């Protein structure tokens, strides 16, 4: 059984790509058709490739991989944070700081500073400092937390990176490739897929689409860590859905009201 059904993908709007004039020709094989100037992603391929991504992430988690979720656009920020936390992994959901992976030593120093400020508050140091200095420390902490809070406890450079919109996260993807870190990503029709190791053709601009795919990747991690029973509820939900015999042509017509 597919980890994500065609019905779920359709309802989340995963099939809507970008305007045809904004496409990347390298995504041609993942495009089903064009409707009203918009590319329609081939959901049959998305179903198959989402399965492959799920298995890849699950197997990595089973081998105790450190997995980093990356998505800094507003449509992805909440899902990336929530699902990474649910899976017991790490995330960056605001601006990617150049060198986050390739200059990990410097990033660790900034994380150490964040933890130092937290300790200062916990041990009572704040109480004996001037209010102006405490205000400056809080301002510094807020900035560090915003950009590095999601990786503050990450023990090492990640073994796998899951990315929402690698077109936007090009710097992150380049750093991962430089270090040989495999990248699993939601790839829309405007993106060059060449640097992505495990591609999930999908609309990366719709909040529901991002939530659906990101949640399934988190499910994969949970299953890899705890075994199949941990995602039994998800599978039961899918099993309860009536089997669909509709073709992608029929599904596209349904969503467009034809």
Swiss-Prot record:
SUPFAM superfamilies: Ribosomal protein S2
Recorded GO CC terms: cytosolic small ribosomal subunit
Keywords of this entry: Ribonucleoprotein, Ribosomal protein
Gene3D superfamilies per record: Glucose-6-phosphate isomerase like protein, domain 1, Helix hairpin bin
Disulfide bonds: none
Record InterPro entries: Ribosomal_uS2, Ribosomal_uS2_bac/mit/plastid, Ribosomal_uS2_CS, Ribosomal_uS2_flav_dom_sf
Listed GO MF terms: structural constituent of ribosome
GO biological process: translation
A Pfam family it matches: Ribosomal_S2
KW Ribonucleoprotein (keyword) present: yes
Coiled-coil intervals, chain numbering: none
Cited PROSITE patterns: RIBOSOMAL_S2_1, RIBOSOMAL_S2_2
Family: Belongs to the universal ribosomal protein uS2 family.
Stored HAMAP family: Ribosomal_uS2_B
The protein's name in its UniProt record: Small ribosomal subunit protein uS2
Organismal lineage: Bacteria, Bacillati, Bacillota, Bacilli, Lactobacillales
The gene coding this protein: rpsB
């Amino acid at each position: 059984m597919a980890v994500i059904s065609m019905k779920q993908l359709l309802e989340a709007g995963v099939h809507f790509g970008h305007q045809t004039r904004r496409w990347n020709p390298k995504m041609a094989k993942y495009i089903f058709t064009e409707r009203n100037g918009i590319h329609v992603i081939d959901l049959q391929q998305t179903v198959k490739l989402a399965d492959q991504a799920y298995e890849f992430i699950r197997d990595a988690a089973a081998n105790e991989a450190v997995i980093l979720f990356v998505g800094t656009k507003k449509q992805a920020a909440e899902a990336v944070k929530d699902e990474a936390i649910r899976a017991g992994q790490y995330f960056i959901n605001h601006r990617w700081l150049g060198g986050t992976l390739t200059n990990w030593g410097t990033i660790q120093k900034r994380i150490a500073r964040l933890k130092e400020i937290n300790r200062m508050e916990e041990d009572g140091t704040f109480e004996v400092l001037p209010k102006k200095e405490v205000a400056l420390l809080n301002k510094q902490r807020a900035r560090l937390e915003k950009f590095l809070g999601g990786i503050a406890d990450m023990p090492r450079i990640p073994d796998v990176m899951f990315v929402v919109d690698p077109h936007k996260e090009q710097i992150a993807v380049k750093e991962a490739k430089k270090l040989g870190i495999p990248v699993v990503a939601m790839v829309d029709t405007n993106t060059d897929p060449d640097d992505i190791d495990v591609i999930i053709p999908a609309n990366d601009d719709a909040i529901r689409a991002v939530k659906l795919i990101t949640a399934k990747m988190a499910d994969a991690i949970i299953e890899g860590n705890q075994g199949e029973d941990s995602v039994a509820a998800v599978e039961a939900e899918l099993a309860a859905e009536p089997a669909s015999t509709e073709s992608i042509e029929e599904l596209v017509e349904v969503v467009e009201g034809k």
